[in-house]
Amino acid sequence: MYAETDFLFALIKDDDWLGDAAETVYRDHRDDLWTSQFTLIELLLVAYREGRDSERVVTNAARLVDVHGDVDTVVAAATYVEDHGFTPFDTLHLVESGDDTIVSSDGAYEGVSSRLDLTAIDEE
Protein backbone atom coordinates (compact mmCIF):
# COMPACT_ATOMS: atom_id res chain seq x y z
CA MET A 1 0.00 0.00 0.00
CA TYR A 2 1.40 3.36 -1.04
CA ALA A 3 1.56 5.91 1.78
CA GLU A 4 0.81 9.40 0.45
CA THR A 5 1.91 12.66 2.07
CA ASP A 6 -1.25 13.44 4.03
CA PHE A 7 -1.19 9.99 5.64
CA LEU A 8 2.41 10.33 6.84
CA PHE A 9 1.94 13.93 7.93
CA ALA A 10 -1.11 12.85 9.96
CA LEU A 11 1.08 10.32 11.76
CA ILE A 12 3.81 12.87 12.48
CA LYS A 13 1.71 15.91 13.47
CA ASP A 14 0.29 15.89 16.97
CA ASP A 15 -2.80 17.87 16.01
CA ASP A 16 -3.76 16.52 12.59
CA TRP A 17 -7.46 15.97 11.98
CA LEU A 18 -6.65 12.66 10.22
CA GLY A 19 -4.37 11.47 13.02
CA ASP A 20 -6.66 8.84 14.53
CA ALA A 21 -7.56 7.33 11.16
CA ALA A 22 -3.91 7.33 10.09
CA GLU A 23 -2.85 5.59 13.30
CA THR A 24 -5.50 2.90 12.78
CA VAL A 25 -4.35 2.25 9.20
CA TYR A 26 -0.71 2.24 10.28
CA ARG A 27 -1.39 -0.22 13.08
CA ASP A 28 -3.36 -2.56 10.79
CA HIS A 29 -1.12 -2.34 7.68
CA ARG A 30 2.33 -1.33 8.92
CA ASP A 31 4.15 -4.13 7.07
CA ASP A 32 2.42 -3.39 3.75
CA LEU A 33 3.05 0.36 3.64
CA TRP A 34 5.68 2.04 1.51
CA THR A 35 6.25 5.41 -0.13
CA SER A 36 8.69 7.17 -2.46
CA GLN A 37 11.29 9.89 -2.22
CA PHE A 38 8.73 12.22 -3.81
CA THR A 39 6.51 11.94 -0.75
CA LEU A 40 9.50 12.90 1.39
CA ILE A 41 10.14 15.90 -0.86
CA GLU A 42 6.52 16.98 -0.49
CA LEU A 43 6.78 16.56 3.29
CA LEU A 44 9.92 18.72 3.20
CA LEU A 45 7.99 21.44 1.35
CA VAL A 46 4.96 21.28 3.65
CA ALA A 47 7.10 21.31 6.80
CA TYR A 48 9.02 24.34 5.48
CA ARG A 49 5.80 26.17 4.57
CA GLU A 50 4.29 25.48 8.00
CA GLY A 51 7.44 26.43 9.91
CA ARG A 52 7.97 22.92 11.24
CA ASP A 53 11.31 21.20 11.77
CA SER A 54 11.91 19.89 8.24
CA GLU A 55 14.64 17.50 9.27
CA ARG A 56 12.49 15.93 11.99
CA VAL A 57 9.46 15.57 9.71
CA VAL A 58 11.41 13.94 6.87
CA THR A 59 13.46 11.69 9.14
CA ASN A 60 10.40 10.52 11.08
CA ALA A 61 8.49 9.76 7.88
CA ALA A 62 11.43 7.78 6.51
CA ARG A 63 11.44 5.68 9.68
CA LEU A 64 7.72 4.91 9.54
CA VAL A 65 7.58 3.14 6.17
CA ASP A 66 9.86 1.68 3.53
CA VAL A 67 10.90 4.44 1.12
CA HIS A 68 11.71 3.70 -2.52
CA GLY A 69 14.22 6.06 -4.06
CA ASP A 70 16.98 8.30 -2.76
CA VAL A 71 16.14 8.84 0.91
CA ASP A 72 19.61 10.10 1.85
CA THR A 73 19.43 13.07 -0.53
CA VAL A 74 16.09 14.24 0.87
CA VAL A 75 17.21 13.80 4.49
CA ALA A 76 20.45 15.69 3.77
CA ALA A 77 18.44 18.46 2.08
CA ALA A 78 16.17 18.73 5.12
CA THR A 79 19.25 19.13 7.30
CA TYR A 80 20.42 22.10 5.21
CA VAL A 81 17.00 23.72 5.55
CA GLU A 82 17.27 23.57 9.33
CA ASP A 83 21.00 24.24 9.74
CA HIS A 84 21.57 26.87 7.04
CA GLY A 85 18.17 28.42 6.33
CA PHE A 86 18.03 27.25 2.72
CA THR A 87 14.75 26.80 0.87
CA PRO A 88 13.80 23.18 0.17
CA PHE A 89 14.55 23.35 -3.54
CA ASP A 90 17.90 25.11 -3.02
CA THR A 91 18.92 22.34 -0.63
CA LEU A 92 17.86 19.61 -3.03
CA HIS A 93 19.95 21.23 -5.77
CA LEU A 94 22.87 21.65 -3.37
CA VAL A 95 22.86 18.06 -2.17
CA GLU A 96 22.26 16.60 -5.63
CA SER A 97 25.12 18.66 -7.14
CA GLY A 98 27.64 16.91 -4.91
CA ASP A 99 31.08 18.42 -5.46
CA ASP A 100 30.20 19.98 -8.82
CA THR A 101 30.02 23.74 -9.30
CA ILE A 102 26.48 25.10 -9.29
CA VAL A 103 25.65 27.45 -12.16
CA SER A 104 23.18 29.94 -10.71
CA SER A 105 22.52 33.57 -9.92
CA ASP A 106 21.29 32.50 -6.46
CA GLY A 107 23.64 33.78 -3.75
CA ALA A 108 22.34 31.22 -1.26
CA TYR A 109 25.13 28.84 -2.24
CA GLU A 110 27.93 31.28 -1.34
CA GLY A 111 30.29 29.81 1.24
CA VAL A 112 28.63 26.39 1.03
CA SER A 113 29.36 25.28 -2.53
CA SER A 114 31.36 26.31 -5.54
CA ARG A 115 29.16 28.53 -7.70
CA LEU A 116 29.45 30.05 -11.16
CA ASP A 117 27.50 33.29 -10.72
CA LEU A 118 25.46 33.99 -13.82
CA THR A 119 25.23 37.68 -12.96
CA ALA A 120 29.02 37.98 -13.17
CA ILE A 121 29.26 36.62 -16.72
CA ASP A 122 30.06 39.22 -19.37
CA GLU A 123 27.91 38.89 -22.46
CA GLU A 124 29.87 38.99 -25.65
Locate the predicted segments by residue:
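A general structural signal for well-ordered alpha-helical segments in protein cores
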Residues: G19, L40, V58, V74-A77
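Alpha-helix C-terminal capping segments
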Residues: T24-R30, L43, A47, T59-L64, ...
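Short, well-structured N-terminal submotif of metal-dependent ribonuclease cores
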Residues: M1-W34, A47-V57, E124
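Acidic catalytic patch
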Residues: D14, R63-D83
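Alpha-helix capping/helix-boundary segments
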Residues: F7, T39, T73, H93, ...
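Anionic, Ser/Thr-rich low-complexity intrinsically disordered regions
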Residues: T39, L45-R49, V57-A61, G111-E123
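Acidic, PIN/NYN-like endoribonuclease modules and their adjacent C-terminal/linker elements
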Residues: D66-V67, L94, D99-E124
